[in-house]
Regions:
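Structured, hydrophobic secondary-structure cores that serve as assembly/anchoring elements
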Residues: 1-103, 107-112, 131-133, 141-144, ...
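Extended, Lys/Arg-rich, non-catalytic nucleic-acid recognition/anchoring regions
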Residues: 94-95, 99, 103-200, 269-271, ...
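Short, charged, solvent-exposed linker or helix-capping segments at domain edges/interfaces
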Residues: 120-122, 296-301, 633-635
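Acidic, small/polar residue-enriched beta-strand/turn segments
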Residues: 144-182, 259-338
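Detector for intrinsically disordered, low-structure N-terminal pre-sequences
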Residues: 148, 174, 221, 229, ...
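Intrinsically disordered, low-complexity peptide-like regions
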Residues: 161-162, 353, 404, 432
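Long, low-complexity, polar/charged, intrinsically disordered or flexibly structured peripheral segments
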Residues: 326-365
Length: 646
C-alpha cells in the first residue's frame, strides 16, 4: 500500500475478491476416419484449406474429408482429426548412402504417414548454404501420378525446403528434429551403421597468394580447443611453392600446445597441412590429428594481419571446413523419388508406400478413439460413415468414460438404413445407450464435390450436425437445442428418405433424431434427444449444458487446490461459481424467473464436514434448472360466442 507523505490523492490496486470463471468451449469437434494421407495422431485443423494440405482432398478412402468440409461449411471453426489406416498400410521410404570412402546406408527419409501418397514425394539433397562442408539442404517436391510419369519427371517446384541440416543430434539443426517439427511431408532417421568419422579438415578456398608478406600470423582452432595465434617463420616470405607453404603451416601448428586438458594432444602433434591439386586448382588442406565426430579445424585472421585470407583459409576467403562427422551426411542427390523401387545410384533401400485394400474393421475405428485421450479442448465426437450400433456404443462409452466426461457423441445410422423401421431396429441395437450421444437419421444427399457423379451422392449427417451444433452454440448458446428451422443444413440437396409426420412420430419417442425437408425451411435437423432413457437427460442441450458447466467449473477453480480449507475458501468458491452462474442465467441459460429459482451454489459446513476437512476434501454443490426444448407446440382454438345485437 502507498505510504502517505504529502497531502493529496493516492491510488492503489486491490483484488476484487472474485476469481472469474471462463465458459468452456463447446463447439470444437473431433473426427475419426480414413484419409488419403496425413498424421495418424490427433491433429488440430482450423479450416478446410489446412485439412487439404495435411490430409488431402475428397477421395475414395472414406467420407472423412466430406464430413470435415461440411462441418466447416455449416459453422464449425476448428476440429481435431484422427486418421485411421488399414492394417497392411505401409510408409514409403528411401535410404541414401553416406559420404564415406566406403559408403554405407546413412539416412532413411520416409513419408510422414503411411499410404501410397508417399510414393509421390521427390527429394533433392545438396550442400547447405551457410556451412556447405558440414550441412546439407533437403528439398521436397510432389510428383505427378507415378503410374504414368517416369521418376524424376513432372516434379513440381519444392513444396518444402530445409537448409543447413546436420546429422549431429546435439545441433539445433539436427535433421530428424527439424523435420519432425516443421515438415508436413517427410521424416528422417539416422541409421545405426552410419558411424563414419574422419579427421576434421579445412579446405582452402583457392590457390594461396605466394609469396607472403612477413610477418605471417593467423589464428587456428583445432578440435574446439580455442583459437591460438600461429606465426610462420620469416623464411616463408620467400616461399613461392604451395607445398613449402603447407610445410610451414604444419610445423607451426604442431608446435602449439593444447589449451584444454580434454583436448587430445594428437590433435596438434599429428596435425597435417598438405597442398592438394595442381596449378590454379591447388588448395591447402589442413587436417586435425584426431579422427572423431567432434574433430575440426577453423582459421580466422589475426588482428591487423590478412595472412589467413591470402592463404585462402578463412571463411571469408572461401575456406570450407569439414568436421569429423561430415561423412555421415547423405550424398548429394537430385530428384530421388521416395518409394520408387526403380531408383538406383546412391539409394541403398526403398520401401514403397501402400494403402492396402482390405476393409477396415470397426474395432480399428473404436481403438483410434484412444488417440484423443490427451486432448482436452474438444467437446463433440463423430466417426463419419461408420454408422453401426457397435460403433455408436463404443463412441458413447468413450465419451461417458473420459475422466471429465466432457465430450458428446454424434451418431448416425447406416447408409442402407432408409426406412423408419430400419432406423428403429438400429436404435434397439444400442446395447448401452446413455445421455452422451444422439442418433441421427437418415443420410443426406449432396452434389459430388469431385464432379465424378452427375447425380447427388449420399453422405453421413454427422459432419453437418457437428457444424450445426457449433453454429447454434455461437449464435444462441449451448442451452439452445440444435434443431428446428434455425438448424438448417448447408450443402445438401435432399435427404435419403422423405419422412411424413406419422413416420416421424414413430421415431421421436424412441429417441431417434430425424433430419427432414420442409417446403419453407429446407433440410433441417428436427430432433434434439439423446438416446438415454433417463428423463432428466433426455434432451441434447441439457446434457451439453451440464458438460459445459462441469468443464468450466473444473478449470475455473483450480486455484482452490491447497488453499486453507475453511470458511474464507468456501466463501470464495461460492462467490466465484455463483458469479459465473449468474452471468449464464442473465444470458438465458437456465429456467426460472429469478436467479434463486434458476440455480444454487452451496459450499459450507454442511457440504464439507470436519471429516472431509481432515481428509483434505472440500465439497461444492451446484444445481441448475435446465432449459428444455418445446418439442410439441399445442395451440387450442375455440369459438367465441358472438354478442347479440341490440
Amino acid at each position: 500500500m502507498p505510504t502517505p507523505s504529502y497531502p493529496g490523492v493516492y491510488v492503489e490496486e486491490t483484488s476484487g475478491g472474485v476469481r472469474p470463471l471462463t465458459v468452456a468451449s463447446t463447439s470444437t469437434a473431433a473426427f475419426v476416419g480414413l484419409a488419403e494421407r496425413g498424421p495418424v495422431s490427433a491433429t488440430r485443423v482450423t479450416n478446410w484449406t489446412e485439412f487439404q494440405r495435411l490430409y488431402g482432398s475428397f477421395s475414395s478412402e472414406g467420407l472423412l474429408a466430406h464430413s470435415v468440409f461440411q462441418y466447416f461449411n455449416n459453422g464449425g471453426r476448428q476440429c481435431y482429426v484422427v486418421r485411421v489406416t488399414r492394417a497392411e498400410a505401409r510408409t514409403a521410404s528411401v535410404s541414401l548412402r553416406n559420404r564415406a570412402e566406403e559408403p554405407v546406408p546413412g539416412l532413411t527419409f520416409s513419408a510422414m504417414s503411411p499410404g501410397a501418397w508417399g510414393n509421390t514425394l521427390v527429394l533433392s539433397i545438396e550442400d547447405g548454404t551457410e556451412d556447405p562442408g558440414n550441412t546439407f539442404k533437403v528439398s521436397v517436391r510432389r510428383q505427378a501420378d507415378p503410374a504414368v510419369v517416369p521418376p524424376g519427371l513432372g516434379a513440381t517446384d519444392p513444396v518444402e525446403e530445409f537448409d543447413n541440416l546436420t546429422t549431429d543430434p546435439g545441433s539445433s539443426r539436427f535433421v530428424s528434429s527439424v523435420l519432425d517439427a516443421e515438415s508436413e511431408f517427410i521424416r528422417a532417421v539416422i541409421l545405426e551403421q552410419n558411424t563414419a568419422v574422419q579427421r576434421g579438415l579445412l579446405r582452402g578456398g583457392g590457390a594461396p597468394e605466394l609469396p607472403l608478406d612477413t610477418p605471417v600470423t593467423f589464428q587456428i582452432n583445432v578440435d574446439g580447443d580455442g583459437f591460438q595465434d600461429v606465426t610462420l617463420p620469416e623464411e616463408v616470405g620467400t616461399v613461392t611453392s604451395p607445398e613449402a607453404a603447407a610445410t610451414a603451416v604444419q610445423d607451426a601448428v604442431r608446435a602449439l600446445t593444447r589449451k584444454k586438458e580434454s583436448t587430445d594432444a594428437a590433435a596438434f602433434t599429428s596435425f597435417t597441412c598438405e597442398a592438394e591439386g595442381e596449378g590454379e586448382e591447388v588448395r591447402l588442406v589442413l587436417r586435425s590429428g584426431t579422427a572423431a565426430p567432434t574433430s575440426s579445424v577453423r582459421v580466422q585472421p589475426a588482428e591487423f594481419d590478412g595472412a589467413a585470407d591470402r592463404l585462402k583459409l578463412s571463411l571469408a576467403a572461401g575456406g570450407r571446413p569439414e568436421d569429423g562427422s561430415a561423412l555421415r551426411r547423405p550424398v548429394n542427390a537430385d530428384l530421388v523419388q521416395i518409394g520408387d523401387a526403380a531408383v538406383q545410384g546412391d539409394v541403398t533401400a526403398v520401401a514403397p508406400g501402400i494403402d492396402g485394400t482390405t476393409e477396415v474393421p470397426e474395432a480399428m475405428f473404436a481403438e483410434a478413439l484412444g488417440r484423443l485421450d490427451n486432448i482436452t479442448d474438444f467437446s463433440l465426437l463423430a466417426v463419419p460413415g461408420i454408422g453401426t450400433p457397435a460403433m455408436m456404443n463404443a463412441g458413447m462409452a468413450y465419451c461417458a468414460n473420459r475422466p471429465l466426461r466432457d465430450v458428446f457423441y454424434i451418431g448416425e445410422t447406416r447408409r442402407e438404413d432408409i426406412t423408419p423401421e430400419q432406423a428403429a431396429v438400429f436404435r434397439r441395437g444400442l446395447t448401452a445407450p446413455n445421455s452422451y450421444g444422439a442418433l441421427y437419421f437418415p443420410w443426406v444427399k449432396a452434389l459430388d464435390p469431385t464432379g465424378q457423379s452427375r447425380d447427388p451422392i449420399m453422405l453421413p449427417p454427422s459432419g453437418y450436425i457437428a457444424g450445426v451444433y457449433a453454429r447454434i452454440d455461437a449464435s444462441r448458446g449451448v442451452w439452445k437445442a440444435p434443431a428446428g428451422t434455425e438448424a438448417s443444413l448447408n450443402g445438401v440437396v435432399g435427404v435419403a428418405t422423405e419422412l411424413s409426420d406419422v413416420q416421424h412420430g414413430t421415431l421421436n419417442p424412441i429417441n431417434v433424431d430425424v433430419i427432414r425437408r420442409f417446403p419453407q425451411a429446407g433440410v433441417v435437423v428436427f430432433g434434439a434427444r439423446t438416446v438415454s432413457s433417463d428423463p432428466q437427460w433426455q434432451y441434447v442441450p441439457v446434457r451439453r449444458t451440464a458438460i459445459m458447466l462441469r468443464v468450466s467449473i473444473y478449470y475455473g477453480i483450480q486455484w482452490a487446490v491447497f488453499e486453507p480449507n475453511d470458511e474464507p475458501l468456501w466463501s470464495q468458491l461460492r462467490l466465484s461459481i455463483g458469479s459465473f452462474m449468474t452471468t449464464l442465467y442473465r444470458q438465458g441459460a437456465f429456467q426460472g424467473a429469478s436467479a434463486s429459482q434458476a440455480f444454487f451454489v452451496k459450499c459450507d459446513e454442511e457440504t464439507t464436514t470436519q471429516t472431509d476437512i481432515d481428509n483434505g476434501v472440500v465439497n461444492v454443490l451446484v444445481g441448475f434448472a435446465p432449459l428444455k426444448p418445446a418439442e410439441f407446440v399445442v395451440v387450442k382454438i375455440s369459438q367465441k360466442a358472438g354478442m347479440a345485437s341490440g
